[in-house]
């Protein structure tokens, strides 16, 4: 009966008559019918919603009539009571009537019906969510199959693995737990930061497995890293590819810096690359959230070759510019095929920097003489050399970008966000600046890698050949 009335009502809606009168009259009639049915159902008449007979086990009765306590009601009775208490929203009624999206029930009818939106289902608690994921297989070591050993360090071993859930390859970073010390602080940092970073140019943390003996981080698997890529192409990259990798590096770093996160350990070994050419920041073990009150950090960060001079001289107060110096060093290395400042000690590293960029003075670097290490070493007075003489394959824009990153005064270094808008990347087009955070640069058909001049026949080193990759992941 109710379905017939609904059809009649919908048919009246479709008539070509003045809209306001038709809506109000039809709704008035429907409202009255709806209220009657709703009241009759609440009076325990055996009539289900929209004219359907209710299931026998769901018949309604008072708890006191059955002699049961309210807390002892059967599931069927509890279900029916919940149904009696339900209120319908405007959206519910509109869906039942299949009204067009541009038609809304007038407010006065909603008030008359006292229709309130039903409570939305509450989100799962953290404990419930963990239990649900555990049922699927997440958080369990047996979900993953270890394949090849990729590397081993003081605290961790990295394996190539496979997920039984998805059949996808993964990287398993197994961190050994010492009962006296617990999980290393680097592992805690890496987990706490990566679980909140969702970007196409940042490695994805898929799962976390905690046992008595180990903490295993499950990452997406990428075939190679930038160091291995350079080795395989004979340290002679296409300048177009240099630009694409550089843009991806800056894109991922800008995302981190916008969230006040410093990577602090940028180097080619920590920039992973898959077969598609997607570059992703990895190894956040030394990363730091800068939102903490203090500005003092350890200066024992960043591999020596990519460490900025202010940190080499002992500065512990730094911000996002610490990463930008490393970006400049990596840019140079991709363009030339050799590291920019390959020093073996802090003093030698500073000597190489000063010999290329000129020995700093109070005029070129205010406050440099305040560093005791600078006064102690007594460096010769070098004059700056033109960068184009050392990186001749870079064009004018590339040299300008490089020089904007390799500045002594940290606050003067170009930021990652500003670097993305540099004219050096103009040839990539405008659409690369409009991508969503999780969208790959290669989702644009105009972005493709070119064959490198030093190409050796395979894009990446095959598993099992040469040294294990990602030695720097520790």
Swiss-Prot record:
User: Which is an annotated GO molecular function term of this record?
Assistant: ATP binding
- Return any one Pfam family short name: Pkinase
Show the segment(s) annotated as Disordered: 44-93
Keyword Phosphoprotein listed: yes
Q: Which CDD domains match?
A: STKc_PCTAIRE3
Write out the tissue specificity statement of the associated record.
Isoform 2 expression is limited to several subcortical nuclei of the basal gangli and the spinal cord. Isoform 1 is widely expressed.
Its UniProt entry gives the catalysed reaction(s) as:
L-seryl-[protein] + ATP = O-phospho-L-seryl-[protein] + ADP + H(+); L-threonyl-[protein] + ATP = O-phospho-L-threonyl-[protein] + ADP + H(+)
Would you tell me the Gene Ontology cellular component terms? cytoplasm; mitochondrion; nucleus
Q: Where does ATP bind?
A: 150-158, 173
**Does the record's keyword annotation contain Ligase?**
no
The active site consists of 265 (proton acceptor)
List S-S links within the chain. Answer: none
- EC annotation? 2.7.11.22
Which residues carry the post-translational modification Phosphoserine, per the record? 14, 74, 89, 98, 117, 132, 440, 443
Q: What class of enzyme is it?
A: transferase
Residue span, Protein kinase domain: 144-425
Keywords for this protein: ATP-binding, Kinase, Nucleotide-binding, Phosphoprotein, Serine/threonine-protein kinase, Transferase
Q: Name one GO biological process term.
A: positive regulation of myelination
Question: InterPro entries annotated for this entry?
Answer: CDK, Kinase-like_dom_sf, Prot_kinase_dom, Protein_kinase_ATP_BS, Ser/Thr_kinase_AS
Q: What is its biological role?
A: May play a role in signal transduction cascades in terminally differentiated cells.
Q: Which family does it belong to?
A: Belongs to the protein kinase superfamily. CMGC Ser/Thr protein kinase family. CDC2/CDKX subfamily.
Question: Sorted alphabetically, which PANTHER family does this protein's record hold?
Answer: CELL DIVISION PROTEIN KINASE, CYCLIN-DEPENDENT KINASE 18
Annotated protein name in UniProt: Cyclin-dependent kinase 18
Q: What species is this protein from?
A: Homo sapiens
């Amino acid at each position: 009966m109710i379905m017939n009335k609904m059809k009649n009502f919908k048919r009246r809606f479709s008539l070509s008559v003045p809209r306001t009168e038709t809506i109000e009259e039809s709704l008035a009639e429907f409202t009255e019918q709806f209220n009657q049915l709703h009241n009759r159902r609440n009076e325990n008449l055996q009539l289900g919603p929209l004219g359907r007979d209710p299931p026998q086990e769901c018949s309604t009765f008072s708890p006191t009539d059955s002699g049961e306590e309210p807390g002892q009601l059967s599931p069927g009775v509890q279900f029916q009571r919940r149904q009696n208490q339900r209120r319908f929203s405007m959206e519910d009624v509109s869906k039942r009537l299949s009204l067009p999206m541009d038609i809304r029930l007038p407010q006065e009818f909603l008030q008359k019906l006292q229709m309130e939106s039903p409570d939305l289902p509450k989100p799962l608690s953290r404990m419930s969510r963990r239990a649900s994921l555990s049922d699927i297989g997440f958080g369990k070591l047996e979900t993953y199959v270890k394949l090849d050993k990729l590397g081993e360090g003081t605290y961790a071993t990295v394996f190539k693995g496979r997920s039984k859930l998805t059949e996808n390859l993964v990287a398993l970073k197994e961190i050994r737990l010492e009962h006296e010390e617990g999980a290393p602080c680097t592992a805690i940092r890496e987990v706490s930061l990566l679980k909140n970073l969702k970007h196409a140019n940042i490695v994805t943390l898929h799962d976390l497995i905690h046992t008595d003996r180990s903490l295993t981080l499950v990452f997406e698997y990428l075939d190679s890293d930038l160091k291995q890529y350079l080795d395989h192409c004979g340290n002679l990259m296409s300048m177009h590819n240099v630009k694409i990798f550089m843009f991806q590096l800056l894109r991922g770093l800008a995302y981190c810096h916008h969230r006040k996160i410093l990577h602090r350990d940028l180097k080619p070994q920590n920039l992973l690359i898959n077969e598609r050419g997607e570059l992703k920041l990895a190894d956040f073990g030394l990363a730091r959230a800068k939102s903490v009150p203090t500005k003092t950090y350890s200066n024992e960060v960043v591999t020596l070759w990519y460490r900025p001079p202010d940190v080499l001289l002992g500065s512990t107060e730094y911000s996002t510019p610490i990463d930008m110096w490393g970006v400049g060093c990596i840019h140079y290395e991709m363009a030339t095929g050799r590291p920019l400042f390959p020093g073996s000690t802090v003093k030698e590293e500073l000597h190489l920097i000063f010999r290329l960029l000129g020995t700093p003075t109070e005029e070129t670097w205010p406050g440099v003489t305040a560093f005791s290490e600078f006064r102690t070493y007594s460096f010769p007075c070098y004059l700056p050399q033109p960068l184009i003489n050392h990186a001749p394959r870079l064009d004018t824009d590339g040299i300008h970008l490089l020089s904007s990153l390799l500045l002594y005064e940290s606050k003067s270094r170009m930021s990652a966000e500003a670097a993305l808008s540099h004219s050096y990347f103009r040839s990539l087009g405008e659409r690369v600046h409009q991508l969503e955070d999780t969208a790959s640069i290669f989702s644009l058909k105009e972005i493709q890698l070119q064959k490198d001049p030093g190409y050796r026949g395979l894009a990446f080193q095959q598993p099992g050949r040469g040294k294990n990759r990602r030695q720097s992941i520790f």
